[in-house]
Amino acid sequence: MIRAVLFDLDGTLLDRHQSLEQFIHDQYNRFISHLMNIEKSEYCSRFLELDNNGYTWKDTVYATLLSEYNITTLTQEQLLHDYITNFQHHCIPFQNMHELLQRLTQQNIKIGIITNGFTDFQMNNLRALNIHTYTNTILVSEAEGIKKPHPEIFERALKKLDVKAEECLYVGDHPENDVLGSEQVGILGVWKRDSFWGDFEHSRVVDDLLEVLSFLEIETKTRQ
């Protein structure tokens, strides 16, 4: 019987693409006096392309933008600081996120978060979505000194939740960091489908977060 569900944040609970798109349009407007010679749609599109679904850190993204568009009145530090400060104001959850977390809570299912990233930045995003009010534990890679898919970060979460691996689901969008990473310690991995990862195949897949509820009755014997 499942007693706990662990979640990734970006691309799983947080609709990162929509959030980032909203943020970069707003950032362009804030710095328009420096960017007025660049079409807004072109600048925003190039930012999203360079971002590479979050796997290129923003200092590199901004350095490339400044170089490509020959922007000399802004620094990458200014833009990065603006990103770190203001992204939280544009966080958009995936559909049914709150309903899922509420229903898990009502069923006395423990809830945890394991996310790679910088602690303050990720905690601000979790608070922006009000996720922290549902969770029993939150592990951010910077604070833990270890990141997914290392098995230790999953084992720490199990210990904090006081559940066995076979009593826990892990829901995430990254095939290796989330699904296969959690399964290497015996957790039941669930893939939150993301077209960015192409044709990854798995026996447990959800497109809508509420579909996670269908896995709560899985018995240990189904893993053998």
Model-derived regions, located:
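N-terminal helical cap/lid subdomain that shapes the substrate entry/recognition surface
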Residues: 2-95
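Asp-based, Mg2+/Mn2+-dependent phosphohydrolase catalytic module
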Residues: 1-5, 102-105, 110, 114, ...
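Short, acidic loop-to-helix structural element flanking the phosphoryl-transfer center
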Residues: 60, 85-111, 151
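Residues in well-ordered alpha-helical elements
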Residues: 41, 59, 95-98, 166, ...
